[in-house]
Amino acid sequence: DKNLATSATIQAAAIEGSQPASDLHRKREYRRDRHGDRVATVATATPLANSITEAYVMQRYLRPDLLEKAGITSFDGWAATFGSQVTEMEMGPAGGFRQKTRFARFQNVPEMLRMWHVAADVKTAEDLKLPVPEIAPRPSDGKREVETVVLQPTPELEDYISSIADRAEMVASRQVSSTEDNMLLISTDGRKAALDLRLVDEDSIQSGPVKLDAVASRILHHWEQTRGREYRDETGGTSPVRGSLQLVFSDLGTPNERRWDAYNELKVKLIQGGMPADAVRFIHEARDDNAKGRLFEAARSGHVAVLIGSTAKMGVGTNVQNRLVAMHHVDCPWRPA
């Protein structure tokens, strides 16, 4: 847990802190007082995920003595030593521009890396030579790069975005209390509306194609192209089950029995396009590791054509690449990394 309470003059760099992180820090400090500096071995695939402050937190966890020797007693001191702040104009959440000061770039990098590598043994994907398949050529230009699909907003979506801008102005001018409306709520509503207006208002009707229509169209296109493709089974022979697999990531609109959700809406569109209902599965069906293992086996063996899930549930440890031909990211994870 890298959420160790950290104060900073740059508001975006401060960490409020969590109980698990504080507990972990206290236990390490206790062991360090009793047994010396070498008290823990830590492994992580994301030493920096949400904020540059996490680099400072990791050094506090692992080698606070090096920070002390360098005369660094706070994040502000660390940032002044190894980074530079820049104040620039940037786009605000509701449109328009605002001044924002942020930790923009590193300085004294060799010195910082020397301190970092005393405790950290860093291995990149290139160092490990991890086998990663090539991205298929884009139909538009033949380049092996991610393809971004741009959709025009419907008039209804444009009207809603305008209302969000009005809400943001009211929050900024303190015409409403933070319990009534705030920028976090506004940002969340904007993300929901960008996926589908029905996530903010179930009765919304849009006059044109929406994002889920485009997603379904592309999934069905790949399915039609690869539904007859043959694959090898675990014995090396030809599998009797034909067809490929596609993964769909969406962190919003997850399955909900009590209200409209994007997952089931997408499934309906795929079924209407000719895909068998039992070929479309949700990662949320798997309630435990055993159920997840069975679902992944069905995906590897060709009994699942589309597996839909969130980053939290399907972003790590998803061993289903045998038949994988496409990944569709319907929305973006709400984190920098």
Give the positions of each predicted feature:
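Conserved strand-helix element at the start of the C-terminal RecA-like helicase core
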Residues: 175-183, 239-264
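Inter-lobe coupling linker of SF2 helicases/translocases
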Residues: 13, 17-50, 61-205, 209, ...
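Conserved helicase ATPase core of P-loop NTP-dependent helicases/translocases
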Residues: 276-311
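A short helix-turn-beta junction within AAA+ P-loop NTPase domains corresponding to the substrate/partner-engaging
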Residues: 55-68, 324-329
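Conserved helicase motor "Helicase C" RecA-like lobe of SF1/SF2 P-loop NTPases
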Residues: 252-282
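SF2 helicase motor core recognition
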Residues: 1, 47-52, 293, 305-331, ...
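A solvent-exposed, charged loop/short amphipathic helix patch at secondary-structure junctions
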Residues: 2-17
